[in-house]
């Protein structure tokens, strides 16, 4: 709803040099065309302050349906929104987030065609971002600020074979940051809004100093939750240093640090939010249903006698865990990258990216006395060194680890062929711990007693060693009117998990070692794009994809048997085949694209949800749904009519997506999606927009037993700034954004797929941003 144009994108060599992308995104180094062929693409026929060039808008020359959110569109986005919300305006993407900012990691869902968030590959400036799990993953929204993004380029069904990912079953989304500037300067912006939102952003540029250029930026976001007590606190730092040896050779270092913490808010059945739309955790410890003293249960003071001098648990009722204070999420992540590009010969280009990601963090959920007591009793009987629960326990989940890798490739232009080949290697480790600790007085407001563990649940390390190889040849024929791409890749992932998987390993089996090797050495991709005339193209593609099973840690940490004597069968790797056929046009007042798609899956894993008795919130588990399929179409376009003096333009996307498994529609997969908007630019200093989003009816589960109603949402913005006759400096701008303009209430906006637990749509939310560029 925040972006006006829904676009495709062609990654050119200039863009690769500008952005330093060593992701081996397809550079468009075509053979020389005749003058008439070149002239066809020199004119941009639809223009505006928030309109990109036509080749970006419609994915010119791409053999797959490639769409993008561009920098022009990002200029109108609300300050501080999640990187996932930038996908809302792209055709086919069903994005549901919690709150206007969308920063709550356990309230995000994305589906495109039949894929979900964990089956989409993400790449940032050539760095593969691994999996999108909140626990142990590398969700893209931790690593971007929209002020630094140049484009977000998505292939909804068939990403290029050169793009590195072990998670993708087809879709790839590349986030590309802006390059360093040749001129010194910077920008400062400040945002204020509802829910006590305050956000600052500052960026400083050195300019080009004898080939060396750099920038650094920092944003700080503080806000209350829109529903209930609790806050959001995010500090985000980005930096980039680039040295250019010549026009084709550079080295670039990038750094991102994200320090984030927020509080949970509850999900619930639809009936809960119909009764109380703002249902939330409590801002004080309740007395009713909470306070009930139990004496003589444990020798807390260690004098070998249980008597009146020992502590007596007081906070033993079930309602004690409805207090908000012990429901927090903390993440501290850093990403380092080093990009290098050079031309070995005039026709042979080498690119490489080395990277390291360090992850640390924890989450906390309170655990009730009764739930802790039952597990404590089991672990005492097993001889574990645990302490009787004191009341409400501190439910600590620790997450941490690192990823190190390198991506490298060569591109060789010979005659009418562009040959690309390369490799990716990554070594990832992830540490997960879970235990329940006592607190002073057994109160959620008490201090953590770090040497009193009420029970243990998990303590394991999982590793992923990934190797991907690829080879691709793009042949230009018929005087560059026909381009045919033939590619193949291989993927191998060695997965292992070592340690205490779950309760049974502590109580019965002891630490375990499990794992599996996932590999497919032949994953082909074939695509073609043909120029029908000066304005129209058709394209088609076919690809096979293979991925590490989603939720691998959750699956391999099932501890129902002793893995050394009775190992559980390992899940199979997920497989998919994707077919696309499409058309794009670029005319004087309109450009657009249309694509038909068909996708089939084998060994598709779908997420179900069960209610955790400790937290009373959904917890994911995974089911092999076997074979599934999806088919439909995606339409997108922009219309700027001449009779309105090119001051008004209309944009829209329409998606039909039928995704099913065993005859049942997949959960959280609406068949119809629509986004559209109207933008008005009467002067150089004013841009106004109103946008709408329609999400069709869908199901909460995989058996079509719980349907969710469709809903619509309007958003708007007004952007003031630029050349004017009022004496206001042209480098100063003021933007107003409104989300959920009509203040719609939708109790089932977000669903934990496979359950009937929901999160409601945020109310109307307003913010204003003042920006100064210098």
Task: Put a short name on every predicted segment.
Residues 415-416, 477-484, 589-591, 595-610, ...:
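Gram-negative outer-membrane beta-barrel transporters
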Residues 110, 127-156, 176, 272-273, ...:
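Short acidic/polar hinge/loop motifs at secondary-structure boundaries
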Residues 84-128:
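Extracytoplasmic beta-strand/coil segments of soluble accessory domains associated
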Residues 43-78, 109, 154:
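N-terminal periplasmic "start-of-domain" segments of outer-membrane beta-barrel proteins
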Residues 339-355, 359-363, 531, 537-543, ...:
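Membrane-embedded beta-barrel scaffold of Gram-negative outer-membrane proteins
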Residues 185-187, 192-222, 227-304, 328-349, ...:
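Transmembrane beta-barrel wall of Gram-negative outer-membrane proteins
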Residues 8-11, 15-16, 30-31, 256, ...:
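Conserved C-terminal beta-signal and adjacent last beta-strands/turns
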Residues 143-189:
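A beta-strand signature from Gram-negative outer-membrane beta-barrel systems
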